[in-house]
Amino acid sequence: MKYSKIPVARSVVALCVAKDIKHVVISPGSRNAPLTIGFTHHDEITPYSIVDERCAAFFALGLAQELKKPVALVCTSGSALLNYYPAIAEAYYSDIPLVIISADRPIERIDIGDGQTIRQKNVFENHILYSANLYSELVLENQSQDPKLQQKQFEAQKHNEREVNLALNKAIEEKGPVHINVPFYEPLYDTVENINVNPLQIFPEIKERHYSEKQLQNYANEWNRAERKMVIVGVAQPNAVEQKFLEGLATDPSVIVLTETTSNLHQEQFFTRIDTLIGPIEKDENREELFNRLQPDILLTFGGMIVSKKIKSFLRNYSPQHHWHIDSKKAYNTFFCLNKHFETDVNSFFSEFFPLTKRTESDYGSFWKDIKGKRQHRHEDYMAEIPYSDLKAMQEIYQKIPKNSVLHFGNSSTIRYAQLFEWDKSLKIYCNRGTSGIDGSVSTAVGASVSSEEPVTIITGDLSFFYDSNALWNNYIPSNFRIIILNNNGGGIFRILPGNKNSENFEKYFETTHNLKAKPICDLYNFDYEKANSEEEIQKVMKDFYSESGKPKLLEIFTPRKINDEVLLEYFNFMKS
């Protein structure tokens, strides 16, 4: 095996391997050659080569999300590093561990006019868990050199080893992005046959906080007194909560549990479609009475970001007396009423809290569960009669997604349409809701498909797909990967939002209408291409869309541009009856 002659490069590789960080996504460059040589020649590393750094970073994010362990990114100096930023922000807000390793020039070469050089030190400081800024190391050919120089080299090496340890441990312990900036002197391509470093290892400490009965008793008393308790679950990994706790919540008549498509939690009594519950009340002449009846005494939340704007608006206007959030790292005051953060994981909290609670008699659960059942019937009636549109196309897709597969959604219309359906509980569902951007949804799904044991599908809008079409520019996409595009010739989400829709400025600067089609991209990247222009054509194509194939497939569904907002808004009017 070959490794860089530069000791710090060998130490970075050795420590990544020691901490089980063995998937490394590399973008080509020269300054990062010492790292690339080491990672690509190590037999325990799985390297990936992806040219576009923005796509590479989201690819790594999808890998890490699926593997549930850190993935490393390696790039050259200069603006290459900045292209990682959108994915780093997503990882930061979604608690996904990424290790960004950037090559740099020595500090004395910064801001003197050297090429491909920017200020890389702490460049991500607002959205990073840890920034490790390493020292440059000289390659000492002759051990009899000046002892002062050798001492300086020794101190630099110890500093570097400590910083790399701290960064990697932070990614492992707290599940988020970290940045290691490694400046290199030339020559960059000299190699040695053995890794020949034994860096200091500082082992990560996974800290678990536990609450005593004394600490929880007052909260348990409040819980037991409350006749209206609402639990909301944001983004979560599949099987994140033990089933016995879900059943305990479901059987308490004073509790209703609201989940989202990305919550990956399933229990028959839960409200899986928040907007179908809230949206019709907004249109109801008795909305004040109904919202007062829905207003909880206690709001308990866990999981990541919430998609539904309707639940945010409701709880900001009808605040609970208490809002408690469970998360080992952070608690966002999403509803403007947070008054307790339980800094622990959900299962630990429930195991300590539930023994102190009791069943509370109330009609809160039964009242809203009755409405839930009625809404389901209205949903079925409405879907049976609507014209061909984005919503109708989503219904056809919903009915054909194979069980036991992984499903990704793009931002922003597709995930909001998805929220109106009750997806099969065997599916693992993801969407980049940390920052809710359109910039990396396809790349994330591609990364997930590489490491997933189940087939992966992404359902996305046209703008989100075309924005991230470089996601297909790599050699790792499996043949069972599927892309479904809802192409309504622009940003259809803006037709749903307030504003004047009948102006040239709206179409040009908000909706950004276009006539692009995905077939040329499929030809370029060797995807099978299918298209559909009607409900019947979708049904026909979907029959064989998931059949075994020699290459990945893309289905482009063309939908009307101007009818979708009317169909969606009328959905909530129809549901209130």
Curated annotation (Swiss-Prot):
Cofactor (UniProt): Mg(2+); Mn(2+); thiamine diphosphate
Q: How is the cofactor bound?
A: Binds 1 thiamine pyrophosphate per subunit.
Q: Name one GO biological process term.
A: menaquinone biosynthetic process
- Catalytic activity as recorded in UniProt: isochorismate + 2-oxoglutarate + H(+) = 5-enolpyruvoyl-6-hydroxy-2-succinyl-cyclohex-3-ene-1-carboxylate + CO2
Pfam families to which the protein is assigned, alphabetical: TPP_enzyme_C, TPP_enzyme_M_2, TPP_enzyme_N
> What is the protein name for this chain?
2-succinyl-5-enolpyruvyl-6-hydroxy-3-cyclohexene-1-carboxylate synthase
What role does this protein play?
Catalyzes the thiamine diphosphate-dependent decarboxylation of 2-oxoglutarate and the subsequent addition of the resulting succinic semialdehyde-thiamine pyrophosphate anion to isochorismate to yield 2-succinyl-5-enolpyruvyl-6-hydroxy-3-cyclohexene-1-carboxylate (SEPHCHC).
Indicate the quaternary assembly: Homodimer.
State the pathway, as annotated in the record.
Quinol/quinone metabolism; 1,4-dihydroxy-2-naphthoate biosynthesis; 1,4-dihydroxy-2-naphthoate from chorismate: step 2/7; Quinol/quinone metabolism; menaquinone biosynthesis
Q: What class of enzyme is it?
A: transferase
Q: Does the keyword Metal-binding apply?
A: yes
| Key words, A-Z | Magnesium, Manganese, Menaquinone biosynthesis, Metal-binding, Thiamine pyrophosphate, Transferase
Q: What are the EC numbers? A: 2.2.1.9
- State the similarity comment: Belongs to the TPP enzyme family. MenD subfamily.
Say which domain of life the source belongs to: Bacteria
Keyword Transferase listed? The answer is: yes
A single GO molecular-function term is:
manganese ion binding
